[in-house]
């Protein structure tokens, strides 16, 4: 959206303007009973869900029903299952501490140089979106650089110098899970304490009066240590997403070690998910304007989620293929590849069209035509009035969140690569469908509050959310 700000001359209206505008960004100020129950449920059961999936693969070859049947029929007790679970080890703790420290070093102390020689890549110091309090934060965008350095050192150490086995991640997968949980809870707790005692921007904090909701959804909007270490950008991208491709490579190496070859399904999962990861880091500057940075506060949802949920559940397909080396027929493999690539194309081009429209203030061509837009206005918490444009051309004229549609197509491709033998690898598409549908509805609720009647005009122009003619 192209925005121009003009000062609101009436200071007397500022308080009311701020109160009205709070619905535009971030999480709620007040907590209804359904939200509270949902938060407590996730706090209690999300860690168990992660453990259950990983344990099911480790002890039951990825069967989701076998552990339940064993306990129900008395063949095993919960204590038996727990006793077989590998504990945290000194080796895993050292590996994880080294990993996180290295990513902190790359993020904080190595300014980006990739933008100097990679045509089209935008890195280095970049501005984020305006916050509810009217603040524009600056970020050191260097995720692609961190990914390249990390993977270069991985290949050198694992394959040339042989300092460690490329299967090292798989071999320590459950002990590393406990380490990731420790970091996830530690950073979430620290962020909450920081929000109460020494927030980076007090004007952007939200307190509901409910401990569980504050802990889960966060208090601070953009918690930082010093000038550049931004919790959101670091934990969203590093260490989880940088690790994503390394985890998959370790799973592929384990498959090679166990069976003497790597299946085409494992190659598909590695390639398709690597495309997504590289896209994330290539467009990290664009990510600064997305919902995670622009709307979500930093709490357990992001802190623990990025440390544990993302690296452990987003990689289930590769883990499953270690235990079940599926070899797809050539037509099926090509079909999965095509679905993944088409989904990625829709995802990327949809986002590119919006970015192009923003950068040029609409002075561009989309699908060979001058783009159409709905003119909108809104007022931020600091009393500034902003003007925006909502794109209704290209993919944005097909559906209001067609980028999510492409994302879901790619997610389905990851799962289909694993065949139809088990439910476990399909958790990802189920989860992403729920997540993106929820984000879609949440985003539209915010936009309705933010733009009012202008949003109604936009909905009339683009009537479908995700699937044209259906939803």
Swiss-Prot record:
It is a multi-pass membrane protein. InterPro entries: ERG24_DHCR-like, Sterol_reductase_CS. PROSITE patterns: STEROL_REDUCT_1, STEROL_REDUCT_2. GO terms for biological process: blood vessel development; cholesterol biosynthetic process; cholesterol biosynthetic process via lathosterol; lung development; lung epithelial cell differentiation; multicellular organism growth; positive regulation of ferroptosis; post-embryonic development. One of its GO terms (cellular component) is endoplasmic reticulum membrane. It is found in: Endoplasmic reticulum membrane. Gene3D superfamilies: 1.20.120.1630. NADP(+) binds at residues 354, 358, 391, 396, 403-404, 443, 447-451, 458. Pathway: Steroid biosynthesis; cholesterol biosynthesis. It comes from the Eukaryota. GO terms for molecular function: 7-dehydrocholesterol reductase activity; cholesterol-5,6-oxide hydrolase activity; NADP binding. Its EC number is 1.3.1.21, 3.3.2.11. It holds the Pfam family ERG4_ERG24. Highest expression is detected in liver, followed by kidney and brain. Keywords: Cholesterol biosynthesis, Cholesterol metabolism, Endoplasmic reticulum, Hydrolase, Lipid biosynthesis, Lipid metabolism, Membrane, NADP, Oxidoreductase, Steroid biosynthesis, Steroid metabolism, Sterol biosynthesis, Sterol metabolism, Transmembrane, Transmembrane helix. The chain crosses the membrane at residues 36-56, 95-115, 144-164, 173-193, 233-253, 262-282, 302-322, 327-347, 416-436. It catalyses: cholesterol + NADP(+) = 7-dehydrocholesterol + NADPH + H(+); 7-dehydrodesmosterol + NADPH + H(+) = desmosterol + NADP(+); 5,6alpha-epoxy-5alpha-cholestan-3beta-ol + H2O = 5alpha-cholestane-3beta,5,6beta-triol; 5,6beta-epoxy-5beta-cholestan-3beta-ol + H2O = 5alpha-cholestane-3beta,5,6beta-triol. Interacts with DHCR24; this interaction regulates DHCR7 activity. Interacts with TMEM147. Oxidoreductase that catalyzes the last step of the cholesterol synthesis pathway, which transforms cholesta-5,7-dien-3beta-ol (7-dehydrocholesterol,7-DHC) into cholesterol by reducing the C7-C8 double bond of its sterol core. Can also metabolize cholesta-5,7,24-trien-3beta-ol (7-dehydrodemosterol, 7-DHD) to desmosterol, which is then metabolized by the Delta(24)-sterol reductase (DHCR24) to cholesterol. Belongs to the ERG4/ERG24 family. This is 7-dehydrocholesterol reductase.
């Amino acid at each position: 959206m192209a925005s121009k700000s003009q000062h609101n001359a009436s200071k007397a209206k500022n308080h009311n303007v701020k109160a009205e505008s709070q619905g535009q960004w971030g999480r709620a100020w007040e907590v209804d009973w359904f939200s509270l129950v949902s938060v407590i449920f996730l706090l209690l059961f999300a860690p168990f869900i992660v453990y259950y999936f990983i344990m099911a693969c480790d002890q039951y070859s990825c069967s989701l029903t076998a552990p339940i049947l064993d306990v129900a029929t008395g063949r095993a007790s919960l204590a038996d299952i727990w006793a077989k679970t590998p504990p945290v080890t000194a080796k895993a703790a050292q590996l994880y501490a080294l990993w996180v420290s290295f990513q902190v070093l790359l993020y904080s102390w190595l300014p980006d140089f990739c933008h100097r020689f990679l045509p089209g890549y935008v890195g280095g110091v970049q501005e984020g979106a305006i916050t509810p309090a009217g603040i524009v934060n600056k970020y050191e965008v260097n995720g692609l650089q961190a990914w390249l350095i990390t993977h270069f050192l991985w290949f050198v150490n694992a394959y040339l110098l042989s300092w460690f086995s490329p299967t090292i991640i798989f071999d320590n997968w459950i002990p590393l899970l406990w380490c990731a949980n420790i970091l996830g809870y530690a950073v979430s707790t620290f962020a909450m304490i920081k929000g109460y005692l020494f927030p980076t921007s007090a004007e952007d904090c939200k307190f509901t009066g409910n401990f569980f909701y504050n802990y889960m959804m966060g208090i601070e909007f953009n918690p930082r240590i010093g000038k550049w270490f931004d919790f959101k950008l670091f934990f969203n991208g590093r260490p989880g997403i940088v690790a994503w491709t390394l985890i998959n490579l370790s799973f592929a190496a384990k498959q090679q070690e166990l069976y003497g070859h790597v299946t085409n399904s494992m190659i598909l999962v590695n390639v398709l998910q690597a495309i997504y990861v590289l896209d994330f880091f290539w467009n990290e500057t664009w990510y600064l304007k997305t919902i995670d940075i622009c709307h979500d506060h930093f709490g357990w949802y992001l802190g623990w989620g990025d440390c544990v949920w993302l690296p452990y559940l987003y990689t289930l397909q590769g883990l499953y293929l270690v235990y079940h080396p599926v070899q797809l027929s050539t037509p099926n493999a090509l079909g999965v590849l095509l679905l993944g690539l088409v989904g990625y194309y829709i995802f990327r081009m949809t986002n590119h069209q919006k970015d192009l429209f923003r950068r040029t203030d609409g002075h561009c061509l989309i699908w060979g035509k001058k783009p159409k837009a709905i003119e909108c206005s809104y007022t931020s918490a600091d009393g500034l009035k902003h003007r925006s444009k909502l794109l209704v051309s290209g993919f944005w004229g097909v559906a209001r969140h067609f980028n999510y549609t492409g994302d879901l197509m790619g997610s389905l491709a990851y799962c289909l690569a694993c065949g139809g033998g088990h439910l476990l690898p399909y958790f990802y598409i189920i989860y992403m469908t729920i997540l993106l549908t929820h984000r879609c509805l949440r985003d539209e609720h915010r936009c309705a509050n933010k733009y009012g009647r202008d949003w109604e005009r936009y909905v009339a122009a683009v009537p479908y959310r995700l699937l044209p003619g259906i939803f």
